[in-house]
Regions:
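Active-site histidine-anchored catalytic micro-motif
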Residues: 2-231, 237-244
Length: 244
């Protein structure tokens, strides 16, 4: 693990950069200046060079889409090609775990670390966790971090493909779900690597539940989806007695 020296910071919006408006808190641009001002106010700020970019427009992460994930992927690959050796992605917490998982697979075999963070309260709000999370993530990258996608939140490093948001009322909102591994790492085929062009997919996800009817499933399949992912019960089973 090599210390990151030339960081790319990608700001997507989210709570961390929200500002008060007459309609309440809203995603806002201009976070680079706020970040620089805060780091300059620290006596022991992380010592690494960084370049800042904003996803346009800044998002409330509840509005995250596949297209946004592809834009993030393109920006990160371009940053790698421009000589950056690490990425810090600032993201809203509602869908941060989804984006971390998506990027984990969109960026398979990426040779640099990608760290996602955000906050439960906006930067500058009383008692906010924003600057602690951001500066903590910078310190992790400065000290050296393995390649791949991970989440830094509330002093914890979490695997990007196994993180879930479990709470909305506390700073320790995220946890890494356990998954035993019994296999060895294998080379990533070129068709799955981060250089492979991607496109949006009309995908639906359906968790199974008691009372689900075949007509519900048929209506979803007839809606024009390209693929349907079924979230089955724990052992992979589902209802089978609907004669429709």
């Amino acid at each position: 693990m090599l210390p990151v020296k030339n960081l790319f910071v990608l700001y997507t919006g989210g709570t961390i950069g929200m500002l008060q408006t007459p309609q309440g808190l809203a995603p806002a641009g201009g976070f680079e200046a706020r970040m620089r001002d805060h780091l300059q106010s620290l006596g022991d700020a992380p010592d690494l060079r960084w370049r800042f970019a904003e996803l346009q427009p800044p998002l409330d992460s509840a509005n995250m889409t596949q297209g946004n994930w592809l834009a993030m992927r393109d920006a990160i690959v371009a940053a790698l090609d421009a000589g950056h050796d690490g990425v810090l992605l600032l993201h809203g917490t509602d869908t941060l775990a989804y984006s971390a998982a998506a990027l984990s697979f969109l960026l398979l075999d990426l040779p640099i670390p990608v760290l996602l963070t955000g906050s439960m309260l906006p930067a500058g709000a009383p008692g906010s966790d924003a600057w602690d999370n951001l500066v903590g993530a910078l310190r992790v990258l400065q000290e050296g971090h393995a390649r791949g996608v991970q989440v830094y939140f509330n002093d914890a490093l979490l695997h990007g493909a196994r993180v879930s948001k479990l709470r909305s009322d506390a700073f320790d909102a995220f946890a890494e779900l356990p998954r035993p591994r019994h296999a060895e790492h294998a080379p990533v085929p070129a068709a799955l690597g981060y250089r492979q062009p991607r496109r949006e997919v009309n995908l639906a996800v359906l968790p199974l539940y008691p009372g689900l009817r075949a007509a519900h499933l048929r209506g979803l399949l007839d809606s024009g989806v390209e693929a349907l992912l079924l979230e089955c019960y724990g052992s992979g089973t589902g209802p089978s007695d609907d004669e429709e």
